[in-house]
Amino acid sequence: ELEITDAIQDLIDHGLTVNPHIVAGWWKDTGKLEDLLEANRLILETFTEQIEGDVDEKSSIEGKVVIEPGAIIRNSVVRGPAVIGNKARIEQAYIGPFTAIMNDVQIQGSEIEHSIVLEGAVITDVASRIVDSLIGKNVRIYRQPMKPSAYRFMLGDNSEVGIRW
């Protein structure tokens, strides 16, 4: 994990000039998941409703929700503040408050809230609600019926998984 001081030092090491500036407004160090989710919450709270995607009559949009052009919402509930990115597809799903769904994400038969889902991720038929999570680019999360019941993981270095029952 790199910190902002590492980036500043790298600029100096490459002979570039680094100058200080006072930042107006809030500042959040997003080096930890909790801080990243808090920054996401603060940003989403500033949004106003903007529905430009395709939402069917079986879906419910509540609160400050941004649905970008090309997004498709089918038989789902989206409760804001939330953003659904371009070309995202949400089907038979619940998208709860403080959730940012980026471009080209697919969520089907699953529930998620207070989370960030990056580009190209696919979440399919997850049995429990996903909360307080950061889902990386092109990640696939799906339920795979296996007997006996089991969890199967492929996790990168320094990963963390919390399982409740």
What are these regions (language model features)?
Residues 1-165:
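Left-handed beta-helix
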